[in-house]
Amino acid sequence: MLLLQFDWNPITGIDIFGNFKLHFYSVMWIVAFLLGFQIMKRIFLKEKVNLDYLDPLFIYTVLATMLGARLGHVLFYQSELISQDFFSIFLPFKFKGGFEFTGFQGLASHGAAIGIIIGMYLYRRKYKYKSLMWILDRVVISVSSGAVFIRIGNFINSEIIGKITDSPLGVRFVQDYYNKRQIVAETGIENYKEAYAAVTNNPQFQHLLDAVPVRHPAQLYESFCYIFVFLILWFIYQKTNKGQQSGYLFGLFLVLLWTVRFFVEFVKEPQGDEYITMFGLNTGQMLSIPFVLIGLYFMFIYKPKTTN
């Protein structure tokens, strides 16, 4: 069973020039948005909605997702950025410790969810072709597909790692255990990329690799579960009458996605300012509970005042 364990020490992007790097994490976001766009296009065509409304919906969704996710991360998990590196909150650069192009890192799904809801509300105020709930019921299908790739991006970056485990599914996250300065110091290799590669490829540094603990690949657990969240939503939308019940898909999305998040948190390491409450639950779990309750409300109690 140990054959299922593996070491994770990848390149995380492609150097363009200077301090600019194309991060694979950013590529995963692009894939998520483009896939979501195609899913929404298919929905618009199926329901004979004017495609002129699709491009602005895409723009609102991208902006709302990125702003909400970034602000959510800062408020919930990394509040020290407000005083220590304020401009990095809004820009794809970090300035503390030297200028570096990082892409948009540090993005929280709870913040993204809130941002999307607000963004769709603002979009609906300008484009009144359907109700807000109609839009939310369909946008969440795209969002659930995108979540699959975002967690793959987290895995590539060796972030949102799991707790130490003896599970046969465990992974050794080399780049989480050793930061760039540490790996250069430990190996004596000046180029940190070559230093990382040497840890897994050069027997001389086997002791450094052996020191890395085996952890749950929590990102992959989530990504795998989100595949089923998407498939369930898509099936209900396409094949059942529930897909036309106002608020049902939106509510089901909240229940499924945040239930997955709640349980995966048990095998995740705390992030940033994350804390454990008196109930033994962490920040991510406490933030997930209201979303599940709201989802149940929309599934079983909500009655629209008007229908489109």
For the regions a language model picked out, list residue spans one by one.
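Hydrophobic, membrane-interfacing alpha helices
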Residues: 1-308
